[in-house]
Amino acid sequence: MVKTEVPDSIRELLPLTAAVFYILFVLAEGEKHGYAIMKEVETVSGGQFIMGPGTLYTTIQRLLELGLIEETSTSSDSERRRRFYRLSRRGRQTLEAELSRMESLVRSAQRRKLVTP
């Protein structure tokens, strides 16, 4: 991962909560609707983080307000009732900053022999 200067407006959001991290993480692959986000989070976390609808939609609302995700429109009649979300540019920068922070933490733990490389 290339080390770049993280803007203060993004740094102040770190560290991310698990719910925020996982939502940004799964949206990095492309737009998804709420239920798909919830199921993908469960999958990528290996079942270690299960997000209920209350947490999901409260967190989505907060991410929209922070400009980390955007609501997209769908042209499909069958999908019109569902709201789809995608990562914004700021959301991608925030996710990258958090991944870099986590990577640094893991390297530090490896140097201290707390985990094996």
Where does each model-flagged region fall?
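Short, Lys/Arg-enriched N-terminal segment that forms or immediately precedes the first helix
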Residues: 1-12
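Basic amphipathic alpha-helical segments that dock to polyanions
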Residues: 56-63
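Beta-hairpin "wing" of winged helix-turn-helix
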Residues: 64-81, 86
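Accessory beta->alpha helical hairpin/"wing" motif in late/C-terminal subdomains of nucleic-acid enzymes
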Residues: 87-91
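Amphipathic alpha-helical dimerization/coiled-coil segments
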Residues: 93-117
